[in-house]
Amino acid sequence: MPKVVPEYKEIAKNKIIQAAIRIFSQKGFHKSTMDEIAREVGVSKGTLYTYFKSKEEILKEIWELNNQNILDLKKTFKEYDCSEVLDELYHMMINSSGLNLSFEITALSSHNDNIKKINKESYESKLESLKDFLQDQQEKGTIKNDTDADILAQILTALYTDVATQLLIGIDSKKVHEKWIKSVTAILK
């Protein structure tokens, strides 16, 4: 068996993940198959299984990559104003190819313990990262500090979910963006 160089392995994994996002978004997680993902990437099913043992494993990797932007919030946007960062989060959300997938995964969590665990870990890590970012912003004096950062993170997460819902059901993205900005300002200033 030929040796696979680490760089190639990462490229191959990334291609699989991107294909899985497309397939999951088009067909839904439950109806998607490993065969379809392999076909989309242009590899054999056996090759696919050398990288990922199941759809749940691919999903976990997708979730970890999607979370990375939020998990690195404090580090990535250290010198930015809080409102700029939250505006960037909005733009990341509307440009996400997996917006509908996110809602499907949340729904699947009630029936699949593996997916529930992945989703719960993802949610908790995003919330913790957002809380840390908000605490840092409070210490800098860029946002109000009379409300606990954990509560602010919960409120912003709920707002984010509502905005995602509005976009998913087809409400005009410019109107949604305006409401996002006004809501974030009302919550944080």
Regions found by a protein language model. Name each.
Residues 94-117, 165, 169:
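Amphipathic alpha-helical segments used for helix-helix packing
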